[in-house]
Structure formats: C-alpha cells, structure tokens
Amino acid sequence: MMISVKSRLKIYKSGTFLVALILLAGCSKSNSSGGSGNVVVKKPDTTVTVVDTTILAPKAVTKTNTQKVYVHYLPWFETPATSGTGKWGQHWTMANEDPDVILPNGRREIASYFYPMIGPYASSDRDVIDYHLLLMKYSGIDGVVIDWYGVQNVDDYPLNKRNTDSIFSRVPATGLQFSICYEDATLAQDKAVANIDTITAAKSDFSYLQSAYFGSSSYVKINNQPLLLCFGPQGLKTPNDWQQAFSVLTTKPRLLTLDYADADAGSSASGEFVWVDSGNLNSLQSFYTNRTPGLNTWFAGAYPGFMDFYKPGGWGNTLFLIDYNNTGTLQSTLSLAKSSNAQYLQLITWNDYGEGTMIEPTLDYNFSFLQTIQTYTGVSYTITELQLIYKWYTLRKKYVGNTAVEKQLTQAYYYLVSLNVAKATAIISALN
C-alpha cells in the first residue's frame, strides 16, 4: 500500500490483501452479488445488443449557474461477478470486511461508514453507470473526472482500465463530458511489480489516453487541449520527466496538478486543482485567495465531509475527520467555490466510500447531497427526478432477462437523456 507524500493525503491500494471474514453476532451470509441482499448484479456483457427502440439524442439541462461542474469518480468497485476471482473487490472489503455478511440492519458488511442506496456494485455494470450518469445530468453536473491507474498489467489496474472504458462508452449518450485524473503514483508499482521503467510506463499510459479518449467530442477540452488532472505529481517527479512522458503526444494536454504542486511538472503544467484536507474551509480559502491569482487554469473543490474507514478496515490509520453537518459542509464548500469566481468546480467525490466523500445517493443521506447540488447549479429538477432515476435502476435489475420490459426501460432511458421526463415517468410508473 502506497501513501501519498504530497500535501494531500490519499491512500493508494495495490496488491492482494488478506481478508479476515468477520461474522458479527446476528449476521447471516449471502451469495448474492449486489444490493443489500435482494438485488442481483448481472455480469457486464458488451456483446449483447441493445433491444430495438427509439434512440433519442441527449439534450443539455438548463442551469442558472454558468460554472462548469465536474465530479471526481472512482471506477474501482468489483463484485464476485466481475472481479475475475469470484470475490468482492478490495474497495468494498479493505483488509477485513465481508460483503457476503448481512448485518442485522439488512446492509452488507462493507469497508465504509456509509452505504450506497443501490448496495455495493460493480463499476463496469452498465445499469449502474447509466444510473450514475443520469443522476449527474439531473443534478446539473457537466461531466465526470475518472480516477485512472494506467494500462499496465499490475494489481487491479486492468480492472480499473476496463471499468473506465465501460463508463466512457456510456457518456456520449447522456450528453455529459468525460476527463481523466491520472494517478501517477502507480508508476512506482509498475516498476516494483513489472519492472517497467517509469517514463516508459507513463508514455504507454499517455499514448492510450490519446488514442482512446482525447479525440472524443465528449472529452473535456480547455482551449482545445484535452483536460488531464494528475493526483500528484508523485511518479513523474521532475519537469524533465513530464516532458519525456508527453513526447509521445501530438497535442499537449491541459495538465492540472494537485494544489501547490504545478512546479514539479514545470512548463507541462497549466494549473492546479484543490483537494480535501484537514484544514477544510481554511485550506480552501487560502488556495483561492493566495494561490489562484498566479495560475492559468484552476479548479475549485467542494465536498460533503470526510470520514475514512482505513483504521477499522485494516488499511492503516485514520487520516482526519470533517463533520458533514447534514449538508452544511457541502453547502459551505460550494459557497466558497462560488465566491472564488472559479470557472471550474470539481465535486469531491461521487463515490469514494473508503474516505466518506461520496455524494451519490446513500441510505445515510438519501438524495440530500444531490439536492444541494441541484440548488447550486440552478437546474429546475428536484428530488422527484432523482427518485425516478432510482426507480428506473431498480426496475432494470428486477426485470433482467425480460426482453419486453427491458425494451420499455431502454426507451425510458432515452426519454430521460432527452429530458422527456413525462414520457419516462409514464413507463416507469406503469412498471413500478
């Protein structure tokens, strides 16, 4: 396990961890691979064609807030159906949790203090991806920034890459945008496990990004440059490292590093993005006031709170705690982002359950974080549309294999991406 040496603390998980199967009193075991005991997550199958239906082009939501709002997304979750090992992925288990254990409250035992409304899921599951992207769209979120580990066959990086590809394949249909946050700390693991030179590995990673993503019309561009965030630098440590790694690219990305770190990338960097740390609002305000005037491009940040599971999960010590204050912390960080006059905002995060920064619907906070974001972005939608999307997802899972119903739900999906809520509601209500 690698720990960031930068000013922002984040745990990097790699390798195989011994999982202690803890059976709590009153708990039971389940072999189901999704939800809280009653939802089966189907294994993704990209060879299955979408049933015949009327495909509708996506329409953009209307927002009163002109700020571009993106959300940091973790694509690292696996179920027994998708992990390749028949086991739950380590980001649901950490070192000692077992999602096959059903707790007295009906929840699966996962490595988090919080619980997804749809239960623990697979990041490559198309239904999950569509559910997430639809929620983002109706919350006024413009796009997703995916945490990406590169292309090397090391640890769980291939699964991360597969899942990212799966998400990217679903983005255009929604009309949202897509970008990458490169975890260059993984380059050290590439070297340690596969003996791949750091620069060579980075070149392979960037070549793939250029061929697979950068050219897409759905990929985020700033001044015609593809946006690339880096959670560091940590692997590429000098300006020369970055120049060498970028030498394989025909178009230089608009590279943003972590706050106060752009000098490590030299002229290859175009700015920075702020991240959550123990200083909370003081750290954000200091970045906006003292740092951003000298930056070409920068991202503000907003988050609901911070409560990591690392110590109880057996992955080291607790980092720090930021109280959620219901939705108070999210509202405060959004308010600072607005007053900073930032052109771009990154929501931290969609689904980092290990650190408790998730804004997606949970059994703990329901839709409240997304409702707060709806108010911030100035969309006309409310919890009603968010609940409708949740119902759509549950029906997708309920009627797996029922071709006639799947066709109706596919049509409802296209009504949703084209903002025809009334027609989507009619289909979903009839089935529900």
Language-model segments: which ranges?
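C-terminal motif of bacterial Sec signal peptides marking the signal peptidase cleavage site
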Residues: 23-26
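Bacterial lipoprotein signal-peptidase II cleavage site
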Residues: 28-36
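N-terminal secretory signal peptides that target proteins for export/translocation
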Residues: 1-11
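Sec-dependent signal peptide recognition
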Residues: 10-18
